[in-house]
Protein backbone atom coordinates (compact mmCIF):
# COMPACT_ATOMS: atom_id res chain seq x y z
CA UNK A 1 0.00 0.00 0.00
CA UNK A 2 1.33 3.44 -0.91
CA UNK A 3 2.00 6.05 1.81
CA UNK A 4 -1.02 8.01 0.62
CA UNK A 5 -3.22 4.91 0.87
CA UNK A 6 -1.97 4.10 4.37
CA UNK A 7 -2.63 7.69 5.49
CA UNK A 8 -6.17 7.62 4.09
CA UNK A 9 -6.86 4.25 5.74
CA UNK A 10 -5.53 5.55 9.08
CA UNK A 11 -7.62 8.72 8.80
CA UNK A 12 -10.82 6.77 8.13
CA UNK A 13 -10.10 4.51 11.08
CA UNK A 14 -9.58 7.46 13.37
CA UNK A 15 -12.85 9.04 12.22
CA UNK A 16 -14.72 5.79 12.84
CA UNK A 17 -13.26 5.53 16.35
CA UNK A 18 -14.32 9.11 17.12
CA UNK A 19 -17.82 8.41 15.82
CA UNK A 20 -18.15 5.38 18.15
CA UNK A 21 -16.80 7.34 21.09
CA UNK A 22 -18.91 10.46 20.44
CA UNK A 23 -22.07 9.33 18.65
CA UNK A 24 -24.11 12.03 16.89
CA UNK A 25 -27.29 13.06 18.62
CA UNK A 26 -30.21 14.80 17.02
CA UNK A 27 -31.50 18.03 18.52
CA UNK A 28 -35.00 17.78 19.94
CA UNK A 29 -37.67 19.25 17.69
CA UNK A 30 -38.25 22.07 20.17
CA UNK A 31 -34.56 22.99 20.23
CA UNK A 32 -34.39 23.01 16.43
CA UNK A 33 -37.42 25.27 16.27
CA UNK A 34 -35.87 27.57 18.88
CA UNK A 35 -32.69 27.84 16.80
CA UNK A 36 -34.74 28.84 13.77
CA UNK A 37 -36.60 31.47 15.81
CA UNK A 38 -33.34 32.89 17.19
CA UNK A 39 -31.76 33.09 13.73
CA UNK A 40 -34.86 34.80 12.32
CA UNK A 41 -34.90 37.25 15.24
CA UNK A 42 -31.23 38.13 14.71
CA UNK A 43 -31.95 38.67 11.02
CA UNK A 44 -34.86 40.98 11.72
CA UNK A 45 -33.39 42.68 14.81
CA UNK A 46 -29.60 42.22 14.62
CA UNK A 47 -27.48 42.92 17.66
CA UNK A 48 -25.45 46.06 17.13
CA UNK A 49 -24.89 49.35 18.89
CA UNK A 50 -26.71 52.38 17.53
CA UNK A 51 -25.25 55.78 18.53
CA UNK A 52 -27.24 57.35 21.33
CA UNK A 53 -29.17 60.59 20.95
CA UNK A 54 -26.35 62.81 22.22
CA UNK A 55 -23.83 61.19 19.87
CA UNK A 56 -26.13 61.61 16.87
CA UNK A 57 -26.79 65.29 17.62
CA UNK A 58 -23.07 65.93 18.08
CA UNK A 59 -22.34 64.09 14.84
CA UNK A 60 -24.85 66.18 12.91
CA UNK A 61 -23.36 69.39 14.31
CA UNK A 62 -19.84 68.25 13.38
CA UNK A 63 -20.81 67.28 9.82
CA UNK A 64 -22.90 70.33 8.94
CA UNK A 65 -21.78 72.19 5.86
CA UNK A 66 -23.51 74.44 3.35
CA UNK A 67 -25.95 72.15 1.52
CA UNK A 68 -25.76 71.80 -2.24
CA UNK A 69 -28.00 69.72 -4.46
CA UNK A 70 -26.34 66.86 -6.32
CA UNK A 71 -28.34 65.90 -9.38
CA UNK A 72 -26.26 62.77 -9.89
CA UNK A 73 -27.07 61.50 -6.39
CA UNK A 74 -30.74 62.44 -6.75
CA UNK A 75 -31.03 60.72 -10.14
CA UNK A 76 -29.24 57.62 -8.89
CA UNK A 77 -31.52 57.27 -5.88
CA UNK A 78 -34.60 57.94 -8.03
CA UNK A 79 -33.47 55.12 -10.31
CA UNK A 80 -33.06 52.81 -7.31
CA UNK A 81 -36.61 53.66 -6.21
CA UNK A 82 -37.91 52.96 -9.70
CA UNK A 83 -36.10 49.62 -9.90
CA UNK A 84 -37.23 48.34 -6.52
CA UNK A 85 -40.63 49.88 -6.03
CA UNK A 86 -41.88 51.71 -9.17
CA UNK A 87 -43.69 54.54 -7.33
CA UNK A 88 -44.88 56.12 -10.58
CA UNK A 89 -47.15 53.11 -11.16
CA UNK A 90 -47.49 51.41 -7.76
CA UNK A 91 -47.73 54.30 -5.27
CA UNK A 92 -51.53 53.97 -5.14
CA UNK A 93 -53.97 51.26 -6.09
CA UNK A 94 -55.35 51.94 -9.56
CA UNK A 95 -57.45 50.12 -12.11
CA UNK A 96 -54.28 49.56 -14.13
CA UNK A 97 -52.19 47.89 -11.41
CA UNK A 98 -55.04 46.25 -9.48
CA UNK A 99 -57.49 44.69 -11.96
CA UNK A 100 -60.67 42.99 -10.88
CA UNK A 101 -60.10 39.45 -9.66
CA UNK A 102 -56.48 40.04 -8.64
CA UNK A 103 -55.43 38.66 -5.26
CA UNK A 104 -53.10 40.71 -3.07
CA UNK A 105 -51.54 40.01 0.31
CA UNK A 106 -51.79 42.50 3.15
CA UNK A 107 -48.27 43.87 3.53
CA UNK A 108 -48.49 44.07 7.33
CA UNK A 109 -49.84 40.55 7.92
CA UNK A 110 -48.60 37.16 6.81
CA UNK A 111 -51.83 35.18 6.76
CA UNK A 112 -54.38 37.39 5.04
CA UNK A 113 -55.02 38.23 1.43
CA UNK A 114 -57.90 39.87 -0.39
CA UNK A 115 -59.36 39.64 -3.86
CA UNK A 116 -60.34 42.78 -5.71
CA UNK A 117 -64.02 42.62 -6.54
CA UNK A 118 -66.31 45.02 -8.34
CA UNK A 119 -67.08 47.05 -5.20
CA UNK A 120 -63.41 47.80 -4.44
CA UNK A 121 -62.28 48.09 -8.06
CA UNK A 122 -64.72 50.95 -8.60
CA UNK A 123 -62.97 52.98 -5.86
CA UNK A 124 -59.63 53.15 -7.69
CA UNK A 125 -58.56 55.84 -10.18
CA UNK A 126 -57.60 54.68 -13.64
CA UNK A 127 -53.91 55.48 -13.05
CA UNK A 128 -51.73 57.36 -10.55
CA UNK A 129 -53.33 60.83 -10.69
CA UNK A 130 -50.17 62.96 -10.70
CA UNK A 131 -48.47 64.80 -13.54
CA UNK A 132 -45.03 63.21 -13.25
CA UNK A 133 -42.36 64.04 -12.49
CA UNK A 134 -43.46 66.39 -9.73
CA UNK A 135 -41.18 69.41 -9.70
CA UNK A 136 -40.44 70.64 -6.17
CA UNK A 137 -41.79 68.58 -3.26
CA UNK A 138 -41.88 69.23 0.47
CA UNK A 139 -42.45 66.31 2.84
CA UNK A 140 -43.50 67.63 6.23
CA UNK A 141 -43.06 65.45 9.29
CA UNK A 142 -44.54 66.36 12.64
CA UNK A 143 -41.40 66.72 14.75
CA UNK A 144 -41.24 69.24 17.57
CA UNK A 145 -38.25 70.85 15.87
CA UNK A 146 -40.80 72.66 13.66
CA UNK A 147 -42.17 74.65 16.59
CA UNK A 148 -40.95 78.26 16.36
CA UNK A 149 -39.13 77.38 13.12
CA UNK A 150 -40.85 79.93 10.90
CA UNK A 151 -40.72 77.44 8.00
CA UNK A 152 -44.33 77.79 6.90
CA UNK A 153 -43.67 80.17 4.04
CA UNK A 154 -40.82 78.03 2.69
CA UNK A 155 -42.95 74.89 2.86
CA UNK A 156 -45.82 76.55 1.00
CA UNK A 157 -43.46 77.56 -1.82
CA UNK A 158 -43.17 73.91 -2.89
CA UNK A 159 -45.23 72.70 -5.84
CA UNK A 160 -46.39 69.58 -4.00
CA UNK A 161 -46.65 69.32 -0.19
CA UNK A 162 -47.01 65.96 1.54
CA UNK A 163 -47.99 65.67 5.22
CA UNK A 164 -48.23 62.81 7.72
CA UNK A 165 -51.15 61.52 9.77
CA UNK A 166 -53.73 64.33 9.52
CA UNK A 167 -51.72 66.95 11.46
CA UNK A 168 -53.33 70.15 12.77
CA UNK A 169 -52.90 73.14 10.45
CA UNK A 170 -54.85 75.81 12.33
CA UNK A 171 -53.67 79.42 12.33
CA UNK A 172 -51.50 78.98 15.44
CA UNK A 173 -49.26 76.58 13.48
CA UNK A 174 -49.19 77.98 9.94
CA UNK A 175 -46.18 80.24 10.52
CA UNK A 176 -44.12 77.13 11.31
CA UNK A 177 -45.64 74.41 9.10
CA UNK A 178 -47.54 76.26 6.38
CA UNK A 179 -51.08 75.65 5.20
CA UNK A 180 -50.67 74.11 1.76
CA UNK A 181 -51.39 70.39 1.28
CA UNK A 182 -51.54 68.25 -1.84
CA UNK A 183 -51.39 64.87 -0.09
CA UNK A 184 -51.83 63.83 3.54
CA UNK A 185 -51.70 60.34 5.03
CA UNK A 186 -54.36 58.97 7.36
CA UNK A 187 -53.66 55.77 9.24
CA UNK A 188 -56.75 53.70 10.12
CA UNK A 189 -55.67 53.87 13.78
CA UNK A 190 -56.26 57.64 13.68
CA UNK A 191 -59.79 57.07 12.37
CA UNK A 192 -60.40 54.71 15.30
CA UNK A 193 -58.87 56.92 17.98
CA UNK A 194 -60.04 60.37 16.92
CA UNK A 195 -63.26 59.66 15.07
CA UNK A 196 -64.62 56.41 16.58
CA UNK A 197 -64.28 54.57 13.27
CA UNK A 198 -66.95 56.89 11.81
CA UNK A 199 -69.59 54.62 13.34
CA UNK A 200 -71.50 57.25 15.34
CA UNK A 201 -70.92 60.67 13.84
CA UNK A 202 -69.21 61.78 10.66
CA UNK A 203 -69.53 65.55 11.06
CA UNK A 204 -66.42 65.98 13.21
CA UNK A 205 -64.35 64.09 10.65
CA UNK A 206 -65.74 66.01 7.67
CA UNK A 207 -65.12 69.32 9.45
CA UNK A 208 -61.53 68.30 10.26
CA UNK A 209 -60.85 67.43 6.62
CA UNK A 210 -61.74 70.90 5.33
CA UNK A 211 -58.35 72.27 6.38
CA UNK A 212 -56.70 70.05 3.73
CA UNK A 213 -58.62 71.66 0.85
CA UNK A 214 -58.39 69.80 -2.50
CA UNK A 215 -55.87 67.20 -1.32
CA UNK A 216 -55.43 63.47 -1.65
CA UNK A 217 -56.03 61.43 1.52
CA UNK A 218 -53.56 58.54 1.29
CA UNK A 219 -54.61 55.50 3.34
CA UNK A 220 -53.01 52.06 3.85
CA UNK A 221 -56.36 50.28 3.61
CA UNK A 222 -54.77 46.96 2.73
CA UNK A 223 -51.81 46.85 5.10
CA UNK A 224 -53.68 45.28 8.03
CA UNK A 225 -57.01 43.53 7.84
CA UNK A 226 -58.38 45.66 10.68
CA UNK A 227 -57.65 48.80 8.68
CA UNK A 228 -59.75 47.98 5.63
CA UNK A 229 -63.20 48.85 6.98
CA UNK A 230 -62.21 52.22 8.54
CA UNK A 231 -60.47 53.19 5.30
CA UNK A 232 -63.51 52.35 3.21
CA UNK A 233 -65.70 54.36 5.59
CA UNK A 234 -63.45 57.37 5.01
CA UNK A 235 -63.89 57.00 1.26
CA UNK A 236 -67.68 56.76 1.43
CA UNK A 237 -68.00 59.52 4.04
CA UNK A 238 -66.13 62.04 1.91
CA UNK A 239 -67.97 60.94 -1.22
CA UNK A 240 -71.40 61.18 0.44
CA UNK A 241 -70.88 64.81 1.52
CA UNK A 242 -69.23 65.87 -1.73
CA UNK A 243 -65.98 66.80 0.01
CA UNK A 244 -63.06 68.34 -1.87
CA UNK A 245 -60.67 65.59 -0.81
CA UNK A 246 -59.96 62.42 -2.82
CA UNK A 247 -59.03 59.14 -1.15
CA UNK A 248 -56.13 57.13 -2.55
CA UNK A 249 -55.38 53.65 -1.20
CA UNK A 250 -51.73 52.69 -0.77
CA UNK A 251 -50.70 49.69 -2.83
CA UNK A 252 -49.55 46.96 -0.40
CA UNK A 253 -46.95 45.73 -2.90
CA UNK A 254 -45.41 49.21 -2.97
CA UNK A 255 -45.30 49.42 0.84
CA UNK A 256 -43.83 45.92 1.11
CA UNK A 257 -41.10 46.68 -1.44
CA UNK A 258 -40.21 49.95 0.28
CA UNK A 259 -39.84 48.04 3.55
CA UNK A 260 -37.51 45.50 1.90
CA UNK A 261 -35.49 48.28 0.29
CA UNK A 262 -34.74 50.00 3.60
CA UNK A 263 -34.21 46.75 5.46
CA UNK A 264 -31.44 45.92 3.00
CA UNK A 265 -29.87 49.25 3.97
CA UNK A 266 -29.85 48.62 7.70
CA UNK A 267 -33.22 49.76 9.04
CA UNK A 268 -34.57 46.98 11.23
CA UNK A 269 -38.00 47.67 12.68
CA UNK A 270 -41.40 46.07 12.84
CA UNK A 271 -42.55 48.70 10.37
CA UNK A 272 -41.22 51.84 8.74
CA UNK A 273 -42.64 55.15 9.85
CA UNK A 274 -45.21 56.90 7.67
CA UNK A 275 -42.69 59.68 7.16
CA UNK A 276 -40.07 57.40 5.63
CA UNK A 277 -42.68 55.83 3.32
CA UNK A 278 -43.58 59.33 2.10
CA UNK A 279 -39.98 60.48 1.67
CA UNK A 280 -39.24 57.29 -0.29
CA UNK A 281 -42.19 57.94 -2.57
CA UNK A 282 -41.17 61.58 -3.03
CA UNK A 283 -37.64 60.57 -4.01
CA UNK A 284 -39.15 58.47 -6.79
CA UNK A 285 -41.82 60.95 -7.90
CA UNK A 286 -40.17 64.38 -7.52
CA UNK A 287 -37.26 66.19 -9.10
CA UNK A 288 -36.41 68.06 -5.88
CA UNK A 289 -37.21 66.93 -2.33
CA UNK A 290 -37.00 68.96 0.87
CA UNK A 291 -38.04 67.47 4.20
CA UNK A 292 -39.11 69.23 7.39
CA UNK A 293 -39.81 68.02 10.92
CA UNK A 294 -37.76 64.83 10.63
CA UNK A 295 -35.94 65.03 13.96
CA UNK A 296 -36.89 62.23 16.39
CA UNK A 297 -34.91 63.53 19.35
CA UNK A 298 -35.81 65.27 22.60
CA UNK A 299 -33.46 68.24 22.11
CA UNK A 300 -32.92 70.58 19.19
CA UNK A 301 -29.64 71.48 17.51
CA UNK A 302 -28.81 73.88 20.34
CA UNK A 303 -29.45 71.23 22.99
CA UNK A 304 -32.71 72.76 24.19
CA UNK A 305 -35.59 70.40 25.08
CA UNK A 306 -38.35 70.13 22.47
CA UNK A 307 -41.69 68.32 22.32
CA UNK A 308 -42.09 65.13 20.31
CA UNK A 309 -44.56 66.74 17.88
CA UNK A 310 -44.97 70.40 17.03
CA UNK A 311 -48.53 70.21 18.40
CA UNK A 312 -48.16 67.84 21.42
CA UNK A 313 -45.69 65.72 23.36
CA UNK A 314 -47.36 62.32 23.02
CA UNK A 315 -44.66 59.69 22.57
CA UNK A 316 -45.06 56.73 20.17
CA UNK A 317 -45.09 53.09 21.25
CA UNK A 318 -41.50 52.04 21.83
CA UNK A 319 -39.99 49.36 19.62
CA UNK A 320 -42.44 49.69 16.73
CA UNK A 321 -40.43 52.10 14.56
CA UNK A 322 -36.67 52.62 14.37
CA UNK A 323 -36.66 56.40 14.23
CA UNK A 324 -32.94 57.05 14.93
CA UNK A 325 -31.98 54.54 12.22
CA UNK A 326 -34.36 56.22 9.80
CA UNK A 327 -32.94 59.63 10.63
CA UNK A 328 -29.37 58.48 9.96
CA UNK A 329 -30.38 57.18 6.53
CA UNK A 330 -32.12 60.46 5.67
CA UNK A 331 -29.18 62.47 7.01
CA UNK A 332 -26.88 60.52 4.69
CA UNK A 333 -29.12 61.38 1.71
CA UNK A 334 -28.94 65.02 2.80
CA UNK A 335 -25.14 64.92 2.97
CA UNK A 336 -24.80 63.51 -0.55
CA UNK A 337 -27.25 66.07 -1.95
CA UNK A 338 -30.08 63.68 -2.88
CA UNK A 339 -32.55 65.59 -0.68
CA UNK A 340 -32.48 68.62 1.59
CA UNK A 341 -33.22 68.21 5.30
CA UNK A 342 -34.23 71.43 7.07
CA UNK A 343 -33.02 71.38 10.68
CA UNK A 344 -32.44 75.05 11.45
CA UNK A 345 -35.15 77.70 11.74
CA UNK A 346 -36.06 79.10 8.33
CA UNK A 347 -35.21 82.70 7.55
CA UNK A 348 -38.22 84.95 7.57
CA UNK A 349 -38.23 88.41 5.96
CA UNK A 350 -37.74 91.24 8.42
CA UNK A 351 -40.88 93.26 9.15
CA UNK A 352 -41.18 96.47 7.16
CA UNK A 353 -40.64 99.61 9.26
CA UNK A 354 -43.78 101.61 9.85
CA UNK A 355 -43.85 105.22 8.71
UniProtKB/Swiss-Prot annotation:
Keyword Ligase in record: no
Main location: Golgi
Metabolic or biological pathway: Protein modification; protein glycosylation; Lipid metabolism; sphingolipid metabolism
Disulfide bond positions: 137-286, 151-346
Residues on Cytoplasmic side: 1-28
BP-aspect Gene Ontology terms: cell population proliferation; cellular response to heat; epithelial cell proliferation; positive regulation of epithelial cell proliferation; protein glycosylation; sphingolipid metabolic process
Catalysed reaction, written as an equation: an N-acetyl-alpha-neuraminyl-(2->3)-beta-D-galactosyl derivative + CMP-N-acetyl-beta-neuraminate = an N-acetyl-alpha-neuraminyl-(2->8)-N-acetyl-alpha-neuraminyl-(2->3)-beta-D-galactosyl derivative + CMP + H(+); a ganglioside GM3 (d18:1(4E)) + CMP-N-acetyl-beta-neuraminate = a ganglioside GD3 (d18:1(4E)) + CMP + H(+); a ganglioside GD3 (d18:1(4E)) + CMP-N-acetyl-beta-neuraminate = a ganglioside GT3 (d18:1(4E)) + CMP + H(+); a ganglioside GD1a (d18:1(4E)) + CMP-N-acetyl-beta-neuraminate = a ganglioside GT1a (d18:1(4E)) + CMP + H(+)
Catalytic site: 321 (proton donor/acceptor)
GO molecular function, one term: alpha-N-acetylneuraminate alpha-2,8-sialyltransferase activity
Lumenal side: 48-355
Family statement: Belongs to the glycosyltransferase 29 family.
Main function: Catalyzes the addition of sialic acid in alpha 2,8-linkage to the sialic acid moiety of the ganglioside GM3 to form ganglioside GD3; gangliosides are a subfamily of complex glycosphingolipds that contain one or more residues of sialic acid. Can catalyze the addition of a second alpha-2,8- sialic acid to GD3 to form GT3. Can use GM1b, GD1a and GT1b as acceptor substrates to synthesize GD1c, GT1a and GQ1b respectively.
Family annotation (PANTHER family): ALPHA-2,8-SIALYLTRANSFERASE (PTHR11987), ALPHA-N-ACETYLNEURAMINIDE ALPHA-2,8-SIALYLTRANSFERASE (PTHR11987:SF3)
Protein name per its UniProtKB record: Alpha-N-acetylneuraminide alpha-2,8-sialyltransferase
Species annotation: Mus musculus (Mouse)
Lineage: Eukaryota, Metazoa, Chordata, Craniata, Vertebrata
